[in-house]
Amino acid sequence: MAFVTTAEVCDANQELIRSGQLRALQPIFQIYGRRQIFSGPVVTVKVFEDNGLIRQFIEEKGNGRVLVVDGGGSQRCAILGGNPVVQAQNNGWAGIVVNGCIRDVDEINGCDIGVRALASHPIKASKKGLGEQRVPVNIAGTRICDGEWLYADTDGILVSQIELSV
């Protein structure tokens, strides 16, 4: 899809919004990284205060995908830091959305990747590799499934069951 704002996507797709095929995430995310606008097919990971699975995905080629991490909204530690974000950038991920905290904000803000997270926190997560991958996640009341499409800009984040064109 050529760049069209999320607001324009919503305006042009009212029927998809009414049917639930196009959903907007609640405006709870902070914007990090140099790429403020990003989109791509979704890969989901569900973890809690552990980033082992996140790191496994980031080591793969991203091919323009968006990693959606449901960290349970925890604000007790950061489940993503600068090194993995640099690796995600280098491996071709379009963006990462974290329902939780990140750290190394200055380093992340220098990366050419889009990152959304609830906040920053200096304490790092464990690395046990606990969690689930490629499962439906629920972030602030919005269900997101592996393989859906995510569109993010400075107005917000949209999730669609199908790839959109306006």
UniProtKB/Swiss-Prot annotation:
Cofactor: a divalent metal cation
Pfam families: RraA-like
Modified residues (N-acetylalanine): A2
Annotated positions binding a divalent metal cation: D104
Keywords: Acetylation, Lyase, Metal-binding
Superkingdom of source: Eukaryota
Enzyme class: lyase
CC cofactor note: Divalent metal cation.
GO molecular function per UniProt: 4-hydroxy-4-methyl-2-oxoglutarate aldolase activity; metal ion binding; oxaloacetate decarboxylase activity; ribonuclease inhibitor activity
Annotated disulfide bonds: none
Gene Ontology BP terms: regulation of RNA metabolic process
Enzyme nomenclature, EC number: 4.1.3.17, 4.1.1.112
Cellular component GO terms, alphabetical: plastid
Reaction equation(s) it catalyzes: 4-hydroxy-4-methyl-2-oxoglutarate = 2 pyruvate; oxaloacetate + H(+) = pyruvate + CO2
Residues annotated for substrate binding in this entry: G81, G82, N83, P84, R103
Subunit structure: Homotrimer.
Physiological role: Catalyzes the aldol cleavage of 4-hydroxy-4-methyl-2-oxoglutarate (HMG) into 2 molecules of pyruvate. Also contains a secondary oxaloacetate (OAA) decarboxylase activity due to the common pyruvate enolate transition state formed following C-C bond cleavage in the retro-aldol and decarboxylation reactions.
Stored PANTHER family: 4-HYDROXY-4-METHYL-2-OXOGLUTARATE ALDOLASE 1-RELATED, 4-HYDROXY-4-METHYL-2-OXOGLUTARATE ALDOLASE 3-RELATED
Listed name of the protein: Putative 4-hydroxy-4-methyl-2-oxoglutarate aldolase 2
Native source species: Arabidopsis thaliana (Mouse-ear cress)
Organism ancestry: Eukaryota, Viridiplantae, Streptophyta, Embryophyta, Tracheophyta
